[in-house]
């Protein structure tokens, strides 16, 4: 049986979804190692805290890092050989790690869920890889990456009660001003619209926490759980990042859940699943949404089109 090593951060639980997909669809033995953690290691007891203080002071070692990243370092050091090594966010690995990993496979691959413009440090790792994948069309053209769109992951779940007309899930970032404007407009015309934003450092207090339409939390919503929340809304809202030339995960989440979507990302027009019945492209500075878009039912898509954007298809593109 072929062997695949998958290395990725645990950000938003994306890694677990890909890991499960690799195990299910690759027909290979898959090893997964986390390269970076959303939450720092927490001491199990006061003895560990004292031990770490001693190690840092007298041995130049960090117990927290060794406990959290020990598995990654062990995989890098050992002599195992893999048919493929697939890495997300290679910029969180050291140059020495990348060189050692390259010696453990004939096919070292990377996939990028953020554009190079958004995370410039990713550029330094490109040369180590035999093949790179990205959802960003400009990066594919500029760096010779292979295009692999994001995907939908829709676990089987019971029908959820509809709570919202329009819902946005995301992080508290530079999009928030236009988010506030859109939410105020939608609620003003009578559509119950809300946003839940993640901010790792937030205690819920910010100028935007005063908005009745926005909830800010420092509790991370894993990727696999966000579907349950999104399924409680009739329509999903997607807002483009300034430094991306492709679609984020939200449009594909809408595909998997068969939900309508409002977006300000003009790239949506280039995809074969676009239809004005299901997707409304807006200008946040001049919002125009027809009443028909809200009142008419979702128009189901052809299964062949849906299949192109499934996790299974995404996995097959990566490992082929």
PLM regions with names:
Residues 254-255:
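Short alpha-helix at the nucleotide-sugar/activated-sugar donor binding site of glycosyltransferases
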